Amino acid sequence: MNKDINKGIIKVSPKALINSKWTKVEVSNQEKHFIITIVKFDEYQKVTECVIEAVMTKNTYAIDWRELKKINTWKMGWQ
C-alpha cells in the first residue's frame, strides 16, 4: 500500500486489507481508529465484502474498500 499524494489517493491492495489499521480524518461518534476485520472475495478474487471495526466502540460497518483510497477521508495506520 503506497500513498500517491499527487492524485489524492492511496494505493490499496485488496489482499492486504485484512487486519490493516486506518484513521478517519473527520472523527464522528468518537470513532477515529479502525481495523479491517472481514474481507471476502469471489471466485475472481474481487472483494465482495469488507467490514471495518471502530477500535474504541467496537462498532462494525460494511464499507466499500475503495473508499479507503481517498486521502481526504482516510489515513493508513493509526495517527
Predicted regions and their residues:
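Short coil-to-beta-strand transition motifs
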Residues: K24-I35
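Basic nucleic-acid-binding interfaces
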Residues: N19, V25, T48, V55-N59, ...
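Intrinsically disordered, low-complexity, charged/polar segments
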Residues: M56-Q79
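Short, conserved beta-turn/loop elements at beta-strand boundaries and strand-helix junctions
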Residues: V39-K46
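Generic beta-structure capping elements
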Residues: V39, E53-V55
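Mixed-charge, Lys/Arg-rich low-complexity intrinsically disordered regions
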Residues: M1-I18
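Short aromatic-glycine-enriched beta-strand elements
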Residues: F34, K46-V51
